[in-house]
């Protein structure tokens, strides 16, 4: 399908931050927008008031999808299921269906670097953006992080570069692939929205489906699912690996504790692993992915080294909070899946007091069980997934104490009680936050405020 063309009328479903920016963009260009949201107008508050000021009618609550029946251009919020009957009916009659980030990709004149994966997206995207800025490039970072780019996309010059973090939900709504596409890894995630694991993997493939032979695809050779993507690519493939030389004329890999970049068969040593400030083996993979993307985008070695040797991470990703009475506290609220919790548990030293649990994404928790059994001293569980996590870790051999917390405040209090000097307290929920918070950022900030208040 070609890129979406603006029409006289459009329906926008889901009135979140990015879609409010999209609505402002559309209204400014004379499109008559109908806003749709399952939340009541009262609960939408200021957003409903802004829609009224813009002259945009709002269909809220029950029946919010009814306007889709008479619109030929529909923009969906990324996280909603795409198989709802009203959406399927619109698709069958030929309506154009897209999202805010899909329109950004359609309109953007600058080359785009897109990053997807089940884990590591934000760190890799941020690293790429910082390296390109250090290289002197005018750089815009957005997508699943930062501010919506739709309101400024037409002002981004062709000589700039745009770096997008792209979720599987967003990729279901795009009609163009980035010039440089990066896939960090793929593991079960978002199975509360995607009908099957196969659908989730297919959504990830959209990042390269519409690439040409002039484009690049950067793949994690250590992930069998991701490496297999190479066979389906029309673009040029670059593999990265922290375990071995993955082969090929172009690759990023580790040899004798040193990051190596190979382009056209010529190898360049980049830096030693102990120069990387980011902790954990998973972050070595993120660095390799970022290094490959940035060299393909023309960044010099000096910019790569400058950033990678100084970059210490992003908020809510194994983020040190404080040391209190000999106990180290870490905020890993971004761990919204078991795979991300595994990365944190692998990185930090035992004994660990682990706070986990939240809303259910339909993912099995068995992957965390071996590390919980090996490294966790006390497990504190909260939220609807607590019983499922307890069952999984007991089945996996964890014999330590498990405490239940009604909320984050109680979880922090229980962790303080359980931890001794030399221990690590880790919030790494392995779950989404929507049972108690608007997003993982709000959850992480609440955790940090509670920890900072301890005395």
From Swiss-Prot:
Annotated compartments: Cytoplasm
UniProt keyword list: ATP-binding, Cell cycle, Cell division, Cell shape, Cell wall biogenesis/degradation, Cytoplasm, Ligase, Nucleotide-binding, Peptidoglycan synthesis
GO biological process: cell division; cell wall organization; peptidoglycan biosynthetic process; regulation of cell shape
EC code(s) of this entry: 6.3.2.9
GO annotations of cellular component type: cytoplasm
A Pfam cross-reference name: Mur_ligase_C
Residue sites binding ATP per the record: 117-123
Pathway terms, separated by semicolons: Cell wall biogenesis; peptidoglycan biosynthesis
Annotated GO MF terms: ATP binding; UDP-N-acetylmuramoylalanine-D-glutamate ligase activity
InterPro entries: Mur-like_cat_sf, Mur_ligase_C, Mur_ligase_C_dom_sf, Mur_ligase_cen, MurD
Reactions catalysed according to its record: UDP-N-acetyl-alpha-D-muramoyl-L-alanine + D-glutamate + ATP = UDP-N-acetyl-alpha-D-muramoyl-L-alanyl-D-glutamate + ADP + phosphate + H(+)
Major location (coarse): cytoplasm
Family membership: Belongs to the MurCDEF family.
Biological role stated in the UniProt entry: Cell wall formation. Catalyzes the addition of glutamate to the nucleotide precursor UDP-N-acetylmuramoyl-L-alanine (UMA).
Cited NCBIfam families: murD
PANTHER family: UDP-N-ACETYLMURAMOYLALANINE--D-GLUTAMATE LIGASE (PTHR43692:SF1)
Official protein name in the record: UDP-N-acetylmuramoylalanine--D-glutamate ligase
Gene: murD
């Amino acid at each position: 399908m070609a890129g979406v063309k603006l029409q006289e009328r459009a329906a926008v479903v889901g009135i979140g931050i990015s879609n409010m920016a999209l609505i402002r963009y559309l209204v400014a260009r004379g499109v008559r927008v109908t806003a749709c949201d399952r939340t009541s107008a009262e609960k939408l508050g200021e957003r409903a008031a802004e829609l009224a000021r813009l002259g945009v009618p709002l269909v809220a609550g029950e029946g919010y999808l009814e306007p889709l029946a008479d619109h030929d251009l529909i923009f969906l919020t990324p996280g909603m299921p795409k198989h709802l009957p009203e959406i399927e009916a619109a698709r069958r009659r030929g309506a154009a269906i897209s999202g805010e980030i899909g329109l950004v990709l359609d309109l953007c004149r600058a080359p785009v670097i897109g990053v997807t994966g089940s884990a590591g997206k934000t760190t890799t995207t941020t690293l790429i953006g910082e390296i390109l800025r250090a290289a002197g490039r005018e750089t815009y970072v957005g997508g699943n992080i930062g501010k919506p780019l739709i309101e400024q996309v037409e002002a981004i010059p062709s000589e700039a570069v745009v770096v997008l973090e792209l979720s599987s939900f967003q990729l279901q709504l795009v009609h163009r692939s980035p010039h440089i596409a990066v896939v960090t890894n793929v593991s079960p995630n978002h199975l509360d929205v995607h009908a099957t694991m196969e659908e989730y993997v297919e959504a990830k493939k959209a990042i390269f489906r519409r690439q040409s032979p002039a484009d690049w695809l950067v793949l994690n050779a250590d992930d069998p699912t991701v490496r297999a993507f190479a066979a389906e690519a029309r673009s040029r493939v670059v593999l990265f690996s922290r375990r071995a030389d993955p082969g090929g004329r172009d690759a990023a890999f580790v040899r004798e504790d040193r990051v190596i970049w190979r382009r056209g068969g010529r190898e360049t040593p980049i830096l030693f692993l102990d120069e990387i400030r980011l902790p954990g083996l998973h972050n070595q993979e993120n660095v390799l992915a970022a290094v490959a993307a940035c060299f393909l985008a023309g960044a010099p070695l000096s910019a790569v080294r400058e950033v990678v040797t100084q970059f210490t991470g992003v908020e809510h990703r194994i983020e040190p909070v404080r040391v209190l009475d000999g106990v180290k506290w870490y905020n890993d609220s971004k761990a919204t899946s078991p795979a991300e919790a595994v990365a944190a548990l692998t990185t930090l030293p035992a004994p660990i007091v682990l706070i986990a649990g939240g809303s259910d994404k339909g993912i099995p928790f068995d992957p965390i069980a071996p590390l919980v059994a090996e490294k966790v001293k006390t497990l504190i569980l909260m939220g609807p997934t607590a019983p499922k996590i307890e069952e999984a870790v007991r089945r996996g051999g964890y014999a330590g104490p498990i405490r239940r917390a009604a909320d984050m405040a109680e979880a922090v209090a229980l962790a303080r009680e359980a931890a001794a000097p030399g221990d690590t307290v880790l919030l790494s929920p392995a779950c989404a936050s929507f049972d108690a918070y608007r997003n993982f950022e709000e959850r992480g900030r609440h955790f940090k405020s509670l920890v900072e208040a301890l005395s």
